[in-house]
Design a protein with these regions (language model features):
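Short catalytic-loop micro-motif centered on adjacent basic/acidic residues
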Residues: 110-113, 172, 279-282
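Short, high-confidence coil segments that cap the C-terminus of an alpha-helix
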Residues: 38-40, 105-109, 218, 273-276
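A conserved beta-strand-loop-helix scaffold within acyl/acetyltransferase catalytic domains
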Residues: 2-48, 52-64, 116-138, 144, ...
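Non-catalytic accessory segments adjacent to catalytic cores
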Residues: 91-135
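Active-site/acyl-donor-binding loops of N-acyltransferases
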Residues: 9, 31, 58-61, 126-148, ...
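Conserved acyl-donor/pantetheine-binding loop and adjacent beta-alpha core of acyl/acetyltransferases
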Residues: 59-78
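Aromatic (often tryptophan-rich) hydrophobic motifs at membrane interfaces
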Residues: 75-83, 94-99, 206-316
């Protein structure tokens, strides 16, 4: 049966369809669409008029420390969502991937597939479309089969949580637009000063509130001390798993309150209480590079495992060179 691919560039044109993968949802598309610096596209695959799969990509502006300094990169979380159990997932993915590559390279210097659930999925299709793999690491906490989220924490982490609370810090879920604005401004300052990771416009979090938080597909947690937000975390929920997308705390100014630690602790505890099976930390780095954030989250009892990311550059000579190096 021939597969029909439809590409959507406007959220208003996307029909409502079933699915549980937030990273390939209409709601996340609309958040990207409404956030400055992002251009989303969604590919819908259908057979006999029925949707069978979808793949969401977001093109964003990126500033680099080496030429070209300003680029557009296309990011995809996972390898799509498949809506029927009998679907030939890899074949469908192969067709969506070829179509996405053609579409995205018109406006992007780089395409990146990240946070893959199965590192081997779609291998031959990535290779046939001239992508190259880079080994990566993932860290996630298993939350099922334990009495509480703290069961696998290191003893020092437990002590820090108790000290932070004893020293006046309070942790709760953000519930107002003002709290979300203060949280995002605080975290933007932290990311720009010491974390080499993209941080979106404040509008991203405001629309996360209206599109995802109200439907319990996301939450923002805040750490307060004397009515000031000094830390926080943002989580997205997809299927049976939780994902910690952004987190941080003003640890130098408020060292005795351990705001960064409390922000992660609250996210893990809430995910466990709400029955999620895992909490995955979204960006823990390359396997051969010392990574302070990875070392930090591992002390919450998570397990480290190998995965990969797939990349494709627009410049053919550069892409061919990296294929020779990486494959």
């Amino acid at each position: 049966m021939p597969l029909k691919l439809t590409t959507y560039y406007q959220g208003s044109e996307i029909p409502d369809f079933p699915g549980t993968n937030t990273f390939h949802s209409k709601e996340l598309f609309q958040i990207y669409e409404e956030t400055p610096g992002y251009t989303p596209l969604l590919i819908m695959a259908s057979e006999d008029g029925k949707p069978v799969a979808r793949l969401l990509a977001a093109i964003r502006k990126s500033i680099r420390m080496f030429p070209p300094a300003f680029i557009k990169r296309c990011e995809i979380y996972g390898t799509g969502e498949y809506l029927t159990a009998e679907a030939d997932k890899e074949r469908i993915f192969g067709e969506m991937l070829e179509h996405l590559t053609t579409e995205a390279l018109r406006n992007s210097f780089l395409i990146e597939f990240r946070n893959l659930e199965n590192a081997m999925f779609g291998y031959k299709y990535f290779r046939s479309n001239r992508y190259f793999p880079v080994n990566w690491l993932r860290v996630r906490n298993s939350l099922h089969g334990i009495e509480n989220a703290e069961q696998r924490f290191s003893p020092s982490r437990i002590r820090q949580i108790k000290k932070g609370l004893k020293n006046g810090a309070k942790v709760d879920e953000a519930r107002t637009v003002e709290e979300i604005r203060e949280f995002s401004n605080m975290l933007r300052h932290l990311y720009s000063s010491r974390i080499r990771k993209h941080f979106p416009n404040i509008i991203f979090f405001q629309h996360m509130d209206t599109r995802l938080i109200h439907s319990r597909q996301a939450k923002i947690f805040i750490v307060r001390y004397k009515d000031k937000i000094i830390g926080g975390s943002a989580c997205i929920y997809s299927g049976n798993d939780a994902y910690l997308w952004f987190s941080g705390g003003m640890r130098k100014t408020y060292a005795l309150q351990y705001p960064g630690i409390l922000a992660v602790w609250k996210a893990l505890r809430d995910a466990h209480q709400n029955g999620f099976r895992h909490m995955e930390f979204m960006d823990v780095g390359l396997p051969f590079k010392k990574h302070g954030y990875r070392d930090f989250v591992l002390r919450f009892g998570g397990k480290q495992s190998s995965t990969r990311r797939w990349f494709r550059f627009r410049w053919q000579w550069l892409n061919d060179l990296l294929i020779k190096i990486c494959v």
